[in-house]
Swiss-Prot record:
Enzyme Commission identifier(s): 2.5.1.15
Assembly and oligomerization: Homodimer or homotrimer.
Cofactor: Mg(2+)
Any GO CC annotation of this UniProt entry: cytosol
Record's keyword annotation contains Transcription regulation: no
Pathway: Cofactor biosynthesis; tetrahydrofolate biosynthesis; 7,8-dihydrofolate from 2-amino-4-hydroxy-6-hydroxymethyl-7,8-dihydropteridine diphosphate and 4-aminobenzoate: step 1/2
The family this protein is said to belong to: Belongs to the DHPS family.
BP GO annotations: folic acid biosynthetic process; tetrahydrofolate biosynthetic process
Species the sequence originates in: Streptococcus pyogenes serotype M6 (strain ATCC BAA-946 / MGAS10394)
Binding site for (7,8-dihydropterin-6-yl)methyl diphosphate: 59, 93, 112, 176, 212, 248-250
Role according to the record: Catalyzes the condensation of para-aminobenzoate (pABA) with 6-hydroxymethyl-7,8-dihydropterin diphosphate (DHPt-PP) to form 7,8-dihydropteroate (H2Pte), the immediate precursor of folate derivatives.
Record-given protein name: Dihydropteroate synthase
Keyword Metal-binding set for record: yes
GO MF, any single term: dihydropteroate synthase activity
Length: 266
């Protein structure tokens, strides 16, 4: 499998989540020192992660805005330390071009933008400048749709075209339907059912639903975040079967066997 110029063995891969934030919904505050972050990265690599997704700002509903300066202070030391110690691809989870540039300079390989280049208008130019793969996620301000799956597909197609127009090569563009972002539980359910339509847009798809509210709903409600890993793994299997190629998860080990087996059947 290729992500731009990078090659990953197999037809599917796990992206392990590393939140260096105090307020992420699942593990906020757990990895706020470089050493704690490195220890977690080492475990995720041992468990089978092929990409580490580093985030310095929580994007959960109601989270506090973090300035680019503070975000850079959180992520750059961790990215540098990962690069110095491990041979692993790193993505930077940010929608701010200033943070993205600092992360790429520190050694990040991939841009993961939850606003698909809409925040400041410079992310696509940066991706083109660095020849960096970029993941474009569906997002919007309100949970209002004509038909959620079609609207998500239209958005992703339009943002991918905007990236192409800005000079990003097609093989550097990935898309993410954005489960849990500006979507009700029912809308997330509908999008899950229509996931194959997203996978038919002509771009590789990242699937990120780990521990989110819709997973809790599928389990009947009232579960804690870390109690959703088994259901997350089941949804990873579903997504890979629909055509997704990367699953973004908190618990790498719970997903590794699923990805290893299904990767050989894709």
């Amino acid at each position: 499998m290729k992500i731009g110029k990078f090659v990953i063995e197999g037809n599917a891969a796990i992206m392990g989540i590393l939140n260096v934030t105090p307020d992420s919904f699942s593990d906020g505050g757990s990895y706020t020192t470089v050493q704690k972050a490195l220890d977690h990265v080492e475990q995720m690599i041992a468990d089978g992660a092929k990409i580490i997704d580093v985030g310095g700002e929580s994007t959960r509903p109601g989270c506090q805005f973090v300035s680019a300066t503070d975000e850079i202070d959180r992520v750059v030391p961790v990215i540098k330390a990962i690069k110095e110690n491990y041979d692993i691809l790193i993505s930077i989870d940010t929608y701010k071009t200033e943070t993205a540039r600092a992360a790429l300079e520190a050694g990040a390989d991939i841009l993961n933008d939850v606003w698909a280049g809409l925040y400041d208008g410079q992310m696509f130019a940066l991706a083109a400048e660095y020849d960096a793969p970029i993941i474009l996620m569906h997002n919007q301000d309100e949970e209002v749709y004509q038909e959620v799956t079609q609207d998500v597909c239209d958005f992703l197609g339009n943002r991918a075209q905007a990236a192409l127009d800005a000079g990003v090569p097609k093989n550097n563009i990935w898309i993410d339907p954005g489960f849990g972002f500006a979507k009700s539980v029912q809308q997330n359910m509908e999008l899950l059912k229509g996931l194959d339509r997203v996978c038919q847009l002509g771009y590789p798809v990242l699937f990120g639903i780990s521990r989110k509210r819709v997973v809790d709903a599928l389990l009947g409600g009232n579960t804690k975040a870390k109690e959703r890993d088994g259901a997350t793994a089941a949804l990873s299997a579903y997504a890979l079967g629909k055509g997704c190629q990367i699953v973004r998860v908190h618990d790498v080990k719970a997903n590794q066997d699923i990805v290893a087996v299904l990767s050989q059947l894709m």
